Amino acid sequence: MKQSRPLRENRKHGDLLFPVSAYETKMEEDFQMPLSYHWHPEIEIFFITSGKANFQVEAEQFVIEEGDVLLIKPNTLHGSHDCFGTKLEFRAVVFDFSVLSWMANVRIELKYLQPLLAQEQGRYILLREKNSIQKALFEMLNKTFFVFDEKEKGYELLVRAYLLQV
């Protein structure tokens, strides 16, 4: 994707040494704030903790709801305009691929990480199935969010470890 593509998000996610950010958004009932359509060069893991919303990734629209986990690949246009007038709470972790690949085993990067993010495999991954693996993934994302939010000494190591586990 070319850098000149419109709707690029201007927000900086993390910093040069640790390009990771975590966000939490809570919307009350009947509050229809759109999640502006945008793209960024980072990976985004978006997970719904309460409610549901119409979501769009590139030209594809679908409903995401409590418990769903959406991995949005780099340089992918995404956003929402309809939260059904219901309470909606979600968290997002946005990070550069280098957080996963830095000092990672080359075999792991080539065999698992690069194919996961390959655009020919689709622009996103949506996990809806409510089984034990998905539940553990959701818990791991919440741990990632809380560790990032607290920012205690060494938090970067835990955030990276949790993201690799996801």
Where are the predicted features?
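Residues at helix-coil transition
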Residues: S50, F146-D149
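A generic structural signal for short coil/turn motifs at secondary-structure boundaries
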Residues: V57, L100-M103, E152-K153
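A short glycine/small-residue-enriched secondary-structure motif
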Residues: V63, V69-K73, G85-R91
